[in-house]
From Swiss-Prot:
Name of a matching Pfam family: Conotoxin
Cysteine pairs bridged by disulfides in the record: 48-62, 55-66, 61-73
This protein's name: Conotoxin Lt6.2
Secreted recorded as keyword: yes
Native organism taxonomy: Eukaryota, Metazoa, Spiralia, Lophotrochozoa, Mollusca
GO cellular component assignments: extracellular region
Major localization class: secreted
Localization, UniProt: Secreted
UniProt tissue specificity: Expressed by the venom duct.
Secretion signal, residue range per the UniProt entry: 1-24
Length: 80
């Protein structure tokens, strides 16, 4: 019975230690588990191009419309 209690307490301490080290090192070399797969920092804001500035993809533009033929951001969606 004592051995069971000791094992349960040891597992609880090891689990708590693992969770705190993941959180502690999330700002350094290690990242939080949710961010490990993407490798991105969600707090970083991305810059976008204003209308009439150059673009390569739609997500480069603030309005999310890129004329790929001319590589220019558009103010409104293109007419189809």
């Amino acid at each position: 019975m004592k051995l069971t209690r000791v094992l349960i307490i040891a597992v609880l301490f090891l689990t708590a230690y693992q969770l705190t080290t993941v959180e502690t090192y999330s700002r350094g070399k290690w990242m939080h588990r949710a961010l490990r797969s993407t490798g991105k920092n969600p707090k970083v804001t991305r810059e976008c191009s204003s209308p009439d500035e150059s673009c390569t993809y739609h997500y480069n533009c603030c309005q999310l419309y890129c004329n790929k033929e001319e590589n220019v951001c558009l103010e409104n969606s293109p007419e189809v």
